[in-house]
Amino acid sequence: KIYTWDASGGVNVRATEITQAPSANNLCAVTVPDRHLVAFGAHDGTQHDTMLVKWCSQEDYTDWTPTATNTAGSQLLSGGSTIIAASRSEGQTLIWTDTDLHSMQYIGPPYTFGFQQVGSNCAVVSSRAFVNFNGVTVWMGLRNFWIYDGSLRVLPSTVNAYVFDDINLTNAPKIHAATIAEYNEVIWFYCSAASTEVDRYVTYNFVEQVWTVGTMDRTSWVDRGVLKYPVGFDGNGQGYNHEKTHNADGVAMVAHVESGELDIAEGDSLMFMTRIIPDFTMQGSLDLTLKTRKYPNATQTATVFTGITSSTEKVDIRVRGRQASIRIESNTTDCDWRYGALRLDIKPDGRQ
């Protein structure tokens, strides 16, 4: 049901049902700039039709019956079995069913809105798993991330396996997306496979086109705007200011980045590494871990170098291996760092 609340009556006045509106619907929204209240997955007067879109007459939420003198109407979508989500976008409203994506655009009399299917097999995973950011809409699907900026395509991701191989889709309705506009980021919170509550996040940076992952319990989020900092709430209702300090409520915020494995001569030769040249802008200190292995299926050997700071010019090492990766990690309070180019002094060490 759809309700209205008149603020002029004060906070003690209860919201009242709009009895002329569909008696059941999946969700509703107001379109702009044409100002129509729209019900998605609406009751048609006889039954609840989860693929039906209905709208009232312009600026009159009590008038839902189409006539020659109003702009009320309806449209039954095809492609799917139920409407999952809807969102205002640039000059249109995007509608996701459980399989497809549709565009709803205001075209004026006599039809009021025009509808077009813009994609198939691109469903959104939940009703809150999308965001609109600078004219672009991105969302989490069932096996991919998607982007729509006038054309629909898969958003390339380096963390697809990490996310979608360990996700609890039974609790998909709890998945939600938010923005961190200050850093050009969109973040999704979701349940890992072993959890029934939100316990992980995945973040995408639009400018740097970089993905990050982590663990955090946030069931709701609002970006900075009226509030000075982004605010998130956990499952217990505790609110947190985010992006305020480099710590996690006074405790060190553990962070790391790890490279893929590198080799030389297409893996035919061993490497002998003699020096790491750090390239950091930072405060605090961090650790470098060099992981090597002699054969692709062999166990990695880790060599740790601690206490790296912005004044560390080089780290002398003597490490051999056929494949190598480097991990950079911080676990101290007030630590803030950015990493530049990876520089290793490497020379071939034979074909063993």
For each feature predicted by the language model, list its residue ranges.
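Surface-exposed flexible segments
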Residues: 5-10, 46-63, 107-109, 192-210, ...
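Beta-propeller and closely related beta-pinwheel folds
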Residues: 9-175
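Elongated alpha-helical scaffolds
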Residues: 1-2
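Beta-sheet repeat architectures centered on beta-propellers
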Residues: 121-136, 142-352
